[in-house]
């Protein structure tokens, strides 16, 4: 899977796309910003944050 840097609203939009109706929890303290903004992350990384 391709990885990409996702920051701010782009990160939230990507979570909406990946998680769909399951929803997701966005807590910067969980490290998602470090994992997906500071470093590139994949769809599989994003799925870890879905509810």
UniProtKB/Swiss-Prot annotation:
S-S bonds: 7-37, 19-50, 36-41
Assembly with partners or alone: Heterodimer of a B chain and an A chain linked by two disulfide bonds.
UniProt keyword Disulfide bond, yes or no: yes
Annotated gene: ins
Family statement: Belongs to the insulin family.
A GO CC term assigned to this protein in UniProt: extracellular space
Annotated PROSITE patterns: INSULIN
GO molecular function (one): hormone activity
Protein name as catalogued: Insulin
Organism of origin: Anguilla rostrata (American eel)
Domain of life: Eukaryota
